[in-house]
């Protein structure tokens, strides 16, 4: 039992020695559906590393170090820890990230995956593979992160469901089968077979994080342990003995070391997926090998505000060695910054280290301008392409208005809000410059509840929060006629039409396969081959709105002075896309096309104050003549319920405009998959519980945007406009432009 019980001070020198050898490093993290036991599992690992007393492991939630996390017994942010572990006579460094399981916090999962090579997927033995399990496994596989499986809460099968040893075995095989089905569905083709988990090979652990024991099949066979022995341990009260003989931390760390690849192996297949540069260049080769002597390249995965040290950027060193005092160049922000301090994490504590080589996770002080998703490089490498942009699965669809009780403290509140958005880019902050109104949007009500709680902690000022409002999107259903937008001084004329942007292009923008920064020829090729675009039109793209998924295309030829006002037209386009003409909701899936222009020769008469309104007004007129409509966000519900209650659960869903997509039945459980408007989801929890007498599990996650029902559209838009203090009547194109 001497595997890893030494305390961190003694370990620092040893950790640095191991950090120089990529073969002895593992970068992994927990991934799971909410409440399946990730953080309790991670606590068990901390105990094994001597960082947590055995008495409190399983109860401590040590990785939940934001006070509200311990209060709610759930993880809302991703936390890091470096663990020292001896296996097979060799010391290893396991850099571990604990991530949230609640659907409202998938943004934290997305960012964590960039630094991981392996994901320990924790599944509750009773609930099995749930929606969020599917989401995080899919995200992991998109980032080429290899999953291994821990089936947790085996005690529930024995104590709650009272299953026999044979039935427990059957339940485990069902979960493994469901898990492998996800890998079959989402894994990159070359890993579909290699990455499926096999209990016989020790790629699946079973246990109870609460009772601190865990085994794999090879371990059980070696020790002569049978399922009947585990059932006996619970029934006869000697479960502590299981924890002593088969400590969970040892089982999980062994599984991670055996089945999660080291950085120098993982980077060989991850770098071609995460980075579009030349793999044969000096920096490309260094990253493929995780070479500590190569040029410095770091992918930033998160940024946190420290009250004493300012902004701390955490990321993975993919090549080179970062040292205190080094200069780094932030690609995309085009600036150099000096690293003032380098750290590794021990839960909430940052430990200062003199350097950190390739393959490791590091925290940096001094690079204040860096943001999650940024790439930091050696200052000589200013032309190197950055890592692929991160793709967030959930979109901010719920909004609250925030107002300081004391107007004099507005600036203080805004400052704290801006810091929150830096830390969590899935939050969306809008401040109306004229009215001073602050709108904060998140992916769900819980996301906003936690954000406002953190705001209260940090801003140290009182404020009010409005009831949550749902965000909608505006779009068009057909091509409009051409509309003329005149500048306020009447010296410039711009001619636009709009049409729906096809779903394939929207998906290419969402997955970052096409971006504004891309080489226009490369982008045109992708659009031609995958979305059927005409080559000239694809090359004419001026800007891509990757926040709301719209594009602006220039189809003009030979217009004098057009190049000089291009940036102002793009700014006008972005302005129009942020709040459309129907109800000031963001536009989505719109292609804006410029077909002609008359531009004044004198720069004084064609500035932004002239060109931006002309652009916006013409776009608004075009939108209103293209059968505009509202899109509402839908959530997907995955429901497990006792078969007797299917009827009552279905009627609750029907009452809330829900639609059942799929239904299957097994011996004890019925499985329903449904879609439901977010607008209808606020009270659904209590109603479902009541309808099924509490015998129900369900999970929700953002599914898609769908047109609001046509029969109710006009009344609903009027209602929405009234709420926002706008004139109730829907505007006409002529409210924005003169007919020409």
Curated annotation (Swiss-Prot):
Broad class of where this protein is predominantly found: cytoplasm
GO MF terms held by the record: GTP binding; GTPase activity; translation elongation factor activity
InterPro entries, A to Z: EFG_II, EFG_III/V, EFG_V-like, EFTu-like_2, P-loop_NTPase, Ribosomal_Su5_D2-typ_SF, Ribsml_uS5_D2-typ_fold_subgr, Small_GTP-bd
SMART domains: EFG_C, EFG_IV
Transmembrane segments: none
Domain tr-type G: 23-264
Residues found modified as Diphthamide: 605
Keyword Nucleotide-binding: yes
A GO cellular component annotation in the UniProt record: ribonucleoprotein complex
Pfam families to which the protein is assigned, alphabetical: EFG_C (PF00679), EFG_III (PF14492), EFG_IV (PF03764), GTP_EFTU (PF00009), GTP_EFTU_D2 (PF03144)
Residues where GTP binds: 32-39, 98-102, 152-155
The keyword Nucleotide-binding is assigned to this record: yes
Compartments where located: Cytoplasm
Keywords: Cytoplasm, Elongation factor, GTP-binding, Nucleotide-binding, Protein biosynthesis
Domain of life: Archaea
Record function comment: Catalyzes the GTP-dependent ribosomal translocation step during translation elongation. During this step, the ribosome changes from the pre-translocational (PRE) to the post-translocational (POST) state as the newly formed A-site-bound peptidyl-tRNA and P-site-bound deacylated tRNA move to the P and E sites, respectively. Catalyzes the coordinated movement of the two tRNA molecules, the mRNA and conformational changes in the ribosome.
Similarity field: Belongs to the TRAFAC class translation factor GTPase superfamily. Classic translation factor GTPase family. EF-G/EF-2 subfamily.
Protein name, as recorded: Elongation factor 2
Lineage of source species: Archaea, Thermoproteota, Thermoprotei, Thermoproteales, Thermoproteaceae
